[in-house]
Amino acid sequence: MQLPSFLEVYKGLISTDSISSTDPSWDHGNEKVIEKMAQWFKDVGFSVEVVEVEPGKHNMVAKMGSGEGGLLLAGHSDTVPFDEGRWNFDPHALTEHNNRFYGLGTADMKGFFAFVYEAAKKMDWSKQTKPLYVLATCDEETTMLGARHFTENAPFKPDYCIIGEPTSLVPIRGHKGHVANAVRVTGKSGHSSDPALGVNAIEIMHEVLFALMQLRDKLVKEYHHPGFAIPSPTLNLGHIHGGDSANRICGCCELHYDVRPLPGISLDGLDNMLRSALKEVEAKWPGRIEITPLHEPIPGYECQHDHPFIGGMESVCETESQTVNYCTEAPFLQELCPTLVLGPGSIDQAHQPDEFLSFDFIDPTIDVLSKSIRKYCF
């Protein structure tokens, strides 16, 4: 049987819509791209299991070899939505132009599975001693549903995991988490000519903002990690809206903010800090302040700094590991085994119009994956 080429697999991945979104009109599911991946990896000799996590949402686990431990190569199969008016190329077609592959998911990150496929296809498996697993998840771009489900139900425990997000082939050993909340203040609207007739939600929100800014200063003073370029947690006031007219007392005001906690700060502990910061304002204005999460919180992640896996992959990649401020599925997969984030392409291309991956990454990525498989599965 003639196996598909690297380019054919890459084109198949990019041409198959797998957008995930919290907006139902954009949430297209990943079943079709998972079906294609499952067949490609079966053709190379993997045993494959596809798990429906939710209707239209699937994870794929492919396995080559037997025994305990081994290496897990992981990533997400979904992409973000796109603004068609800002793209010069078809997002759902792999376009080769100026030594680049253009298309939605070329860098972030379902294109990674074409590299895994190619490395596996070229491998001589006759002396394999430990299994190689390939995990493709759903909904990383929204809820991390696929990674959460896999971690909670994992039928095996690999020795190590590599997540193929775009890191320019630099091993990433840690990143901050992400927590985003909405604070909704409900006042009482009325005519602005008599403030006593109402309760101004914007004025209450002013007190909320002051309390959160005090907490922001406290986080900077009390938490520090020298491994990060921005060594403290960050708290950002990102969006606010209130009122409907200059001559009305504002009856409702809503704030959206996010916090990026360092590794080691527990989500429960952070939630307690956030709620404690607003405790006095809530006591002053009972029943008028509501706090709700904007998405499932994501903890910070760090592979133990002296773990031999870091040194081993630094040797394979011939570069030192780093930390970053964006989020991946690593906090969840790290619960199973030491995990690094490492893949082709630049994070600068993620979620951008005309997303691309440079041809310069093709051979080095296949080489790094091949060396990693031989190092941890042979």
UniProtKB/Swiss-Prot annotation:
Binds 2 Zn(2+) or Co(2+) ions per subunit. Homodimer. It comes from the Bacteria. Zn(2+) 1 binds at H76, D108, E165. GO terms for cellular component: cytoplasm. It comes from Vibrio atlanticus (strain LGP32) (Vibrio splendidus (strain Mel32)). This is Acetylornithine deacetylase. Catalyzes the hydrolysis of the amide bond of N(2)-acetylated L-amino acids. Cleaves the acetyl group from N-acetyl-L-ornithine to form L-ornithine, an intermediate in L-arginine biosynthesis pathway, and a branchpoint in the synthesis of polyamines. The lineage of its organism: Bacteria, Pseudomonadati, Pseudomonadota, Gammaproteobacteria, Vibrionales. Belongs to the peptidase M20A family. ArgE subfamily.
